[in-house]
């Protein structure tokens, strides 16, 4: 793993659907060189694949992010994202039917895992039911997260312009994101999250972030960078702005796209029933 390989991986966190041609241009590599490196990262198991993150708000659910000491493993059917951290801590994104439902689920987890170290539960969420077009695009991306617009068009029968417009809208709102599944031990890059009551003041994280969830000043930002040295600089700045910010270094992560697909299928089926 050299610096160029690490830059490839970090760039994929920021844009999991970036084409190899564009990636080669960004890194000043020939198409052949980039293709060789990309395939080697796949063959060596550094890149394990790609997955689709779908914000629960997009399928008419509420979400919260919570962290607990990892005394034991849990696998509830409402956990959509699980992140194992260096600090003997697990971070979970959970979904629910309402704010109160989420609070009940945090209480349920607390009975098994102890009191949470962090709870981020945005109150002013606005879940909604997606359009049929959005559902078709998401289903196609779940099958092939790095599918090009033309491939999605062939799969769904939708015009390429419609697909591109909807993807831009969904990605700009952090509702949908294609992410690489990286073996972080092999990759030797650093993925970290910061939770702060004043995350809005940490604009310096813009250069490394690939996911962001904010409500007013409060929020969570997730970043990827090529080295621990780079990460330490970001974390030092974060502590200077907010001494109480919570920092989590990721060692492994998983995303349950199947939960999103099931919820979207339920929405689709109910719409069909109502139309009869």
What are these language model-derived features?
Residues 1-276:
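A compositional/biophysical signature of low hydrophobicity enriched in polar/charged and small residues
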């Amino acid at each position: 793993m050299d610096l160029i390989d690490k830059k490839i991986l970090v760039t994929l966190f920021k844009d999991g659907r970036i084409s190899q041609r564009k990636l080669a241009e960004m890194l000043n590599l020939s198409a052949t060189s980039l293709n060789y490196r990309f395939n080697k990262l796949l063959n060596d198991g550094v890149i394990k694949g790609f997955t689709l993150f779908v914000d629960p708000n997009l399928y008419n659910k509420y979400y919260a992010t919570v962290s607990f000491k990892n005394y034991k493993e849990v696998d509830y059917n409402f956990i959509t994202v699980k992140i194992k951290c260096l600090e003997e801590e697990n971070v979970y994104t959970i979904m629910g039917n309402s704010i109160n439902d989420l609070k009940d689920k945090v209480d349920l987890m607390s009975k098994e895992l102890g009191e949470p170290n962090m709870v981020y539960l945005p109150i002013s969420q606005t879940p909604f039911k997606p359009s049929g077009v959005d559902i078709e695009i998401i289903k196609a991306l779940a099958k092939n997260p790095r599918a090009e617009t033309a491939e999605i068009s062939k799969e769904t029968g939708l015009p390429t312009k419609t697909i591109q417009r909807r993807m831009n809208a969904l990605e700009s709102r952090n509702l949908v994101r294609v992410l690489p599944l990286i073996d972080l031990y092999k990759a030797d890059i650093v993925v970290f999250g910061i939770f702060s009551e004043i995350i809005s003041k940490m604009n310096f994280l813009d250069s490394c972030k690939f996911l962001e969830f904010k409500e007013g000043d409060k929020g969570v930002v997730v970043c990827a960078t090529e080295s621990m040295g780079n990460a330490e600089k970001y974390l030092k700045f974060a502590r200077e702005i907010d001494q109480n910010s919570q920092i989590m270094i990721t060692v492994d992560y998983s995303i349950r796209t199947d939960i999103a697909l099931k919820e979207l299928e339920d929405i689709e089926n109910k719409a069909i029933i109502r139309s009869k």
